[in-house]
Amino acid sequence: MGDYRYTCEGSHMKAPIGARVSIRFHDPEGGFRDLVGYLESENSLRNRHGELIEFDVEKIAIYKVIEEKIHSAGHGAPLSIRIQELERILTATWPPLRQEFFGKWLIRTSGKFTMRANSVLPSGKAPYGEPSQDIDSSIAHVITHYEKEGLAPIFAIPLPTYADLDSKLFEQGWIEKVRAHVMVADIAEHVFGQSKFKTLISDNFDESWLALQEDHGVAELMRGYPALYASVFDGEKLIGVGRTAHAEGWSALSRVFVDPQYRGQGVSKLIVNALLQSSLEAGIKKSVLQVDSKNLTAINLYTSLGFDFHHEYVYRSYQKTLQILSEGCC
């Protein structure tokens, strides 16, 4: 539960995107109706079931911003609930071009760029989540959907919640493509030491930012949600980049990349610290990121910055070949 910190009347909400709100609307037939959830835009919110609901701001009678009770990152609720919360945040801050619910499974479609934006995220009760049909029919529906899109069918399976689903897909021949750690941290003040490199934070990116790691393919996805972008320079040369986006009180880090010639010089740490400090200044107290489970160098870096392992997920593909850009999460 949260605390109601202030109440406002009228149709012009000042609540920030990502805030949890309770909104009361005038009902055309008389009386009122209420919605509670996290704001995703000026006229939409996502409720506790993960459903996106649009509303008419002109019909708002009153609204309240609910300030959540603060728990340490990765604590405060059963693991299965925390996993679903974090996966919801990671989807919100890296939104697919199209998404639709199949029961409580979320089917995400975005062309050929990134597995997260082109995969099914199960949700609901274990062992398989809660699709709208029996499990075998639901898997067949997923295959049909992505094959019609010209894409490899992929599941993004949070573990251990849906370990039985992972096993079932494995038995049916689905191939493991990537296994990733989800790591979390409480954000603390960051004291920046002397550095010969210059760090800038912006609310947008430019051609040079995209070009550093050939990120042109994900530009449209990144524009789909407000974010902060870090750039590190050696003189006039761009040598490192990173991104964070805020949702539900979390800072979701992604796209951290350093020019190979500058690796081992603390540039990654500069990027992450700058993004976390900017998040803290925006009132964000917790951070989450994804990293390939095989990337021990990055895992050690994030551990040194206070991140702890929370859970892992696996991408399983129905085909042995996959024409989708790999998830670049760190």
Which role does the model predict for each range below?
Residues 2-11, 15-17, 60, 68-79, ...:
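Short amphipathic alpha-helix that is part of the acyltransferase structural core
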Residues 2-102, 106-111:
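Conserved RNA-binding domains used in RNP assembly and mRNA/RNA metabolism
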Residues 149-158, 279-290:
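Conserved GNAT acetyl-CoA-binding A-motif
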Residues 134-143, 255-258, 264-281, 300-304:
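Conserved acetyl-CoA-binding loop-helix of GNAT-fold acetyltransferases
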Residues 219-260:
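A conserved beta-strand-loop-helix scaffold within acyl/acetyltransferase catalytic domains
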Residues 94-98, 106, 134-207, 316-318:
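Acyl-donor-binding surface of acyltransferase catalytic domains
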Residues 156-163, 260, 289-299, 315-322:
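Conserved beta-strand-loop-alpha-helix junction that forms the acyl-donor binding cleft
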Residues 160-176, 269, 293-312:
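Conserved active-site alpha-helix within GNAT-family acetyltransferase domains
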